[in-house]
Amino acid sequence: MRKNRKSISKRHQSKARPGPSQQAFDDICFIELEALKEHEEIRPDYLEQLKNEILSDGILKMPIAVDKNTYIILDGHHLLHALKKIGCKRIPVILFDYQSPEIEVIPWREDENITKEMIVQTALAGRRMPPKTSRHMILIKGELKHISILEKDINIPLDKLK
């Protein structure tokens, strides 16, 4: 694993969540897994590790980030696939306005270029980019933060998602 990547456990711990300067997101709601649109492939090793952690906990700790207009996943591809493997039918999401200027996308790798338009076109066409191609950021008090900073702890029992 690369140094700058958080372990699964650390990613699911509580975080300070300062609010964005404008309303770029909505509260948590539940969406059927099949309604969501993906734009990235997943890493099978990470998927299996995440699935096992969720099963061990017996709860889902965090929602995923989704565009409210297209249902494109902004953050949470691996979580979606883990829940599918577990047999869940729906998932808690935070809906974001992907067109908001507060939301930006940057590549994980320096030698790549990625735009919101590329992500939307890829997802709507049913195609996938390589794993960890995009990193969705949100402007909070003049500073770009990873969108997961707004993903609240929810601790929902898995049977509520089946």
What are these regions (language model features)?
Residues 2-69, 74, 80-162:
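Short, charged/polar connector segments at secondary-structure boundaries
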